[in-house]
Structure formats: C-alpha cells, structure tokens
Amino acid sequence: MNINVADLLNGNYILLLFVVLALGLCLGKLRLGSVQLGNSIGVLVVSLLLGQQHFSINTDALNLGFMLFIFCVGVEAGPNFFSIFFRDGKNYLMLALVMVGSALLIALGLGKLFGWDIGLTAGMLAGSMTSTPVLVGAGDTLRHSGIASTQLSSALDNLSLGYALTYLIGLVSLIVGARYLPKLQHQDLQTSAQQIARERGLDTDANRKVYLPVIRAYRVGPELVAWTDGKNLRELGIYRQTGCYIERIRRNGILANPDGDAVLQMGDEIALVGYPDAHARLDPSFRNGKEVFDRDLLDMRIVTEEIVVKNHNAVGRRLAQLKLTDHGCFLNRVIRSQIEMPIDDNVVLNKGDVLQVSGDARRVKTIADRIGFISIHSQVTDLLAFCAFFIIGLMIGMITFQFSNFSFGIGNAAGLLFAGIMLGFLRANHPTFGYIPQGALNMVKEFGLMVFMAGVGLSAGSGINNGLGAVGGQMLIAGLVVSLVPVVICFLFGAYVLRMNRALLFGAMMGARTCAPAMEIISDTARSNIPALGYAGTYAIANVLLTLAGTLIVIIWPGLG
C-alpha cells in the first residue's frame, strides 16, 4: 500500500498540527554550544520549512492557541501584579518600563529607517526581545485593525518572518551580554551580592540545601537542671541558643505541651524539634547519655506545607516580623512568581508569595491561618472559573474606542490578559476560587504557545526565501541593536538614577527581558541567588508590558508617516 504523506497531511489539519509540534519539540532539544534552541524556535523552524512546501492549517487553531497562551500569562502574573504596580515595586516598575519602552522606540525608528512594513517591524521587536507576548499582541491587533485583507495577509506573514529571523539573535546576544556586561563595571556581582547579604542577613548560597526538622528525645539530668539555673522556658530562650524548640514534655508519666512558664525538672523527658545540625550543636548537658526512645513522646506528625500569603496582617510585613520560630515552625523556602527567593529577614511579603514551612501539623495549621492559607494540593482545575474569565476576556476585547475618524479596539490579547490577571489575583485572595494546578497552567500555556507558533510558521513559510534575501542583513543589525541597547540603557538608568545594588539590578534586567537562561548566568556569576529578588520584581509586570508593546507598535505605526 502506497501512502502519500503530503496528501495525508494536507487532508488532515489535526494530524499536520501534531506532526509539526512533535518534530519542532524534538528540534528544540538540540543545543548550539551551551544554548538550547528551545521549544518555541524549534516549532517555528519546522513550521516554516513545511510552510515552504505549502502546508497550512485552519487559522482558528492559531487563534485559540494564542488566546490560551496570553490568558495563562495573565493568570500567572495576577497574584503579584497589583502589589508591584501600586506599592513596593516602584524601581522594578520603572526598570521594566525603561526596558520595554526603549525597545519599542528603537524598533519603530529602525523599521522606518529600513522602510519595513509594520509586520516586519513588530516581528523584529518580538524576536529581538525573545518575547512571544509581543508577537501575540501585535498579531491580534493587526487582525482587528481593519486594513485590507491582502495587506493583512502580508503583514501577518512578515510578522512571523521577522520573529523567526531575530529570535536566536535576541536570545544569544542577551546570554552573551549577561555573561560579559557585568565584567565591564567597577563592582563585580559577587561583591554586590555579598554586600547586600551583609546588609540584610541573607544566605547567599545559590544551592542552599533544605533539610526537614527531626525529633529527638532527651532525659533531663543534673547537668541540664544546673544549666537551666531555675529559669523557665521563656527566660531560657532555648531556640535562640540551640536552634531547637521543646515540643513535648513527659513528667511523671504524663505527656504535655509546655508553655513558656514551664521549668525543667530532674527526670523530665523532653522532645526537641530542630534541624539535624541544630541537634548536633546541642550542649553536652542535653545529649551525653541522655537520649531516650519513647514512642509516645516521639509520635508527632511533622509536615511541610506551602502557605500562600494573603492576610492583611502579613502582607507588607517583613519576614522577620512573622516570628515563625517562636511558633515552633521552620521556614524552608520563599517563592515569588515561581522564583525561589533568598531567605532574607528583610524581604517584604507580597500577596501571593508562597512560604514552605515545616513543623508539627497543628502548629503549621495555626501559623497558616494567621498569615494566609495552605495551598491546595489538588490536581483538579476549576474549569468553571477558567471558562468564565476566558469569556469575560473575549468580551472585553470587543470594546472599541472611536476618536473622530480613527478607531481602535482593545483586542483579544489585552482583554484576555486583563481577565487572566483578575483570575490570578482573585485566586491569591480566595483559596477556594479559581484553583488551577501549576502543572496544568504550564501545560495549557505551553500548548497554546506551540499551536500559535505552528500556525504562524506555516502561514509565513511560503515567503521566507524572498524575505530572507531582501532583509536578512538588516534584520541581523536591527536584532542586535534592539536586543542589547535597551539592556545598556536599563543598566545605566538603574545604576546611576535609581542607584540600585548591582546584583539586584542585573536580576531585574533579566526579569524585564523575561529570559530565564540569562538569569541563570547572572546567578552563576554572582554565585548567589540574590539576583532572583530583582528577577521576580520585574518579571510579572514585564510580561504585561510586553503584550501591550505588541499592541502599541501596531497602533502607533500609521501615525509615524
């Protein structure tokens, strides 16, 4: 039996789509030196090659892909977006505005200089910034711009062409810049990280090991009674001295949870909870020949829970003010926007931050009720909320503004982004509403993006040879300029106007570019995870601004003449 593969693919859009995705994802795993191509560029390259052979898919699939992607971007940004916008993120907001704004202006200028159309210009901006949200925002605005169908088709083809030609340029140039730009300043990143670590009492080890607390039991002997000198537990401050706290006491055969007024007596058996190294540092009066193995005394349920910061008495306060150890709880991690932060007593908590806390189940539940709620470890997505806010986003996108003879619409990209932000924000405030497991959110976002990339590549593939020959050299120059010049401007602004610590500044710059590979290089150079503080500060707001930049470049273009 003979099978004509070309006819088979042309006759089945779904089969063609998944063939493109599978081949593109395989290609995306290839590495050029230390740089991995990545899923987006892999799918785009494969779709462009097949597009040259005149394969195509229904545009409805492309539209659904970008809608899912941009909605999920909003959901991820929602918990932190308003806190960054309105409160303690002024510097991070300004950095993101400078980065995105300067790139937008430079792209507009180069597009006019080289005589490109809006499609090539917007695609070059998206590729140079390695930002799919720019591509999505520009594409959606073009479709709702009301231009003639022939011009629209050409602009959309050039949009994906510009993106494809400059994406790798933008990615590689930023990675190289992240490696060498820190060396051109007077203060190296490691020194900057150590400086802010001393100021804030940070752990600068990027690979800090996290241990769970363990329970050990000891019998109180003469040495320990003498060591306490008649003081009660509150006066002794055992945690401050040892890093362990007394969870239970057995006295005369009776188990009890001690309060601060309890005084240790000869023959008491005490259960101490602490990290392994804290037990190792205990005074010999605790340990020497005194350890006991009492099943009832040691029978405690030590749990590790992820607590989402929500309550007003925790939001805006410093980490040290929570006094977790005074409540018998141990802090393992602080996570913001999926980025692990250094455990810094001076970190100001934002709504939606996640604290990984260990301790007795009862104590962890108490502290969770005080500062927020325990994250739901469920694999069930609230599809009703997902669909409802998706519909709201589409309806917002239909809103059109009329100014004399000029009109423009909000568009699906901005509408869905706003609706996603609202869903993410409400989820951070109401734990039982709109729950979407992070794995499910990542899957939908990635799948939507890959479908969108496959669609734009197949649409643009037929004209790539002509486009490459006409503008290839110009694209190379423009891609480098738009990728690197805003980074330099952002560095100068942050260093000499905002006077930011260099480790935080470089992390914030990579967050404003939403580039995780470059962020890893900055952390390696600093030998610290302190730059993650800056990265998390700009990442959420930059995703939103980049989407708006894609919309703005299309709106502004006709007015430039």
Curated annotation (Swiss-Prot):
Is this entry keyworded Transport? yes
Instruction: Name a biological process GO annotation.
Output: potassium ion transport
Gene Ontology MF annotations: monoatomic cation transmembrane transporter activity
The protein's matches in InterPro entries, at most eight in alphabetical order, are given as: AAE_transporter (IPR050144), RCK_C (IPR006037), RCK_C_sf (IPR036721), Transp_YbjL_put (IPR023017), YidE_YbjL (IPR006512)
GO cellular component terms, A-Z:
plasma membrane
Domain RCK C-terminal, which positions?
200-288, 292-373
- Annotated membrane-spanning segments are 8-28, 32-52, 66-86, 94-114, 158-178, 383-403, 406-426, 447-467, 475-495, 540-560
Q: Where in the cell is it found?
A: Cell membrane
Gene3D superfamilies, per the entry: Regulator of K+ conductance, C-terminal domain
Q: Which UniProt keywords apply?
A: Cell membrane, Membrane, Repeat, Transmembrane, Transmembrane helix, Transport
Q: How does it sit in the membrane?
A: Multi-pass membrane protein
Q: Name the principal localization, coarsely classed.
A: membrane
- HAMAP family to which the protein is assigned, alphabetical: YbjL
Matching entries from NCBIfam families are given as: PRK04972.1 (NF003440), YidE_YbjL_dupl (TIGR01625)
Q: What does the similarity note say?
A: Belongs to the AAE transporter (TC 2.A.81) family. YbjL subfamily.
What protein does this entry describe?
Putative transport protein YbjL
Origin organism of this chain? Salmonella paratyphi C (strain RKS4594)
* Name of the gene encoding the protein in the UniProt record: ybjL
